[in-house]
């Protein structure tokens, strides 16, 4: 069976969406002195870096960015293809931070549950919020993003593929049916 690919966000639409996410994060954060972004490997990391660049452009403040690997915190290791763990790099103290976890797509909520468990091993932020580029629904856990770039109702058998310039040489979001 041939799969069809539908572009959901073009490079320009992604740029605008990232700018909007940055603006929403700034508005909700209020005081930016304790704001920090933590991208979830793999695509959440460059996404967090792009959002941080936009915040700096908008506000003139450099927001610290970290990278979180959740491989060994997952509850579905027996069901997924195990990848080589990435490096967690958190170059700031999490304690007391206004932390925004960033991921490309939220689906069942299990990645975010694992990320929350991992964060607790590194410190205790004052508040943890969640920003995602795409929310495709079908949650299995009571986890919802605070900031969403695009809500995209999908069928369970469909896939959402995010392409990022830093990793893939282009920016786009596609729905694979």
UniProtKB/Swiss-Prot annotation:
GO molecular function: uracil phosphoribosyltransferase activity
Keyword GTP-binding: no
Superkingdom of source: Bacteria
Keyword Ribosomal protein: no
EC top class, as a word: transferase
Motif (PRPP-binding): 99-111
Keywords from the named record: Glycosyltransferase, Transcription, Transcription regulation, Transferase
Protein family (similarity comment): Belongs to the purine/pyrimidine phosphoribosyltransferase family. PyrR subfamily.
The protein's role, per its UniProt record: Regulates the transcription of the pyrimidine nucleotide (pyr) operon in response to exogenous pyrimidines.
Protein's recorded name: Bifunctional protein PyrR
Organism: Picosynechococcus sp. (strain ATCC 27264 / PCC 7002 / PR-6) (Agmenellum quadruplicatum)
GN (gene name): pyrR
